[in-house]
Design a protein with these regions (language model features):
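Iron-sulfur-associated redox domains of electron-transfer enzymes in respiratory
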Residues: 1-201
């Protein structure tokens, strides 16, 4: 299967490789999932707000995610809230992501408003929606999705975390194809080594 977290890659598949679409993961990008979660679970359990009053703004590394946020099919939070009687069935349709800015856009906003991120407070109460993992941090890097998936697969199959979580061999900044073999000791089979072969394109 091909991952689907990059909307530019997904659009490329839709336009140029339509026959391969059945092999693309049906999972939305993390930003789109976050938008839907914000207007369902977080609206109720974190902010105690009507989901129609929640505005989700994504700050993204690329313009493809702005395009993704504008796709009319991404109204899952609205559908869920209607189906579960959280909002009336005749409520106007709303998107999972209301606004999307690139990191360059937000830097320009900061510049115009005279905000210096380096001079902002560094500590505050951490909210449930602000917690993240190392795998989540590398997700947006080239090869990061694969590295995050490998870390998780290793932990699940071996029953322990990788001693060195950096899997440099799947990072592909300068190559169009990167292949790697990751040996995993299978806990359920007494430590028998399973070689997981992966590729990043």
């Amino acid at each position: 299967h091909f991952t689907s977290c990059c909307p530019g890659w997904v659009r490329n598949m839709e336009i140029n490789f339509a026959s391969a679409i059945p092999h693309v993961s049906t999972t939305k990008s993390p930003i789109q999932m976050g938008g839907a979660l914000g207007k369902t679970w977080a609206a109720k359990h974190v902010w105690n707000k009507d989901p129609r009053d929640v505005c989700i703004v994504s700050i993204t590394p690329c313009t493809a995610k702005i395009f993704e946020a504008s796709r009319p099919e991404f109204i899952d939070a609205w559908k869920w809230n209607v189906e579960h009687n959280v909002i009336p069935k005749d409520s106007p349709v709303f998107p999972d992501i209301d606004y999307s800015l690139t990191t360059r856009d937000i830097a320009e906003v900061f510049r115009r408003l005279g905000i210096d991120p380096l001079k902002m407070p560094t500590t505050h109460e951490v909210k449930p929606t602000e917690k993240y993992t190392g795998a989540g941090t590398i997700f947006g890097c080239s090869g990061g999705v694969m590295e995050a998936a490998l870390r998780t697969a290793y932990a699940l199959l071996a029953g322990e975390e990788l001693k060195n979580p950096d899997i440099i061999s799947v990072r592909g900044l300068n190559n169009s194809l990167v292949e790697a073999t990751v040996p995993i000791p299978l806990k359920a089979q007494g430590g028998k080594i399973f070689e997981l072969r992966v590729a990043v394109v």
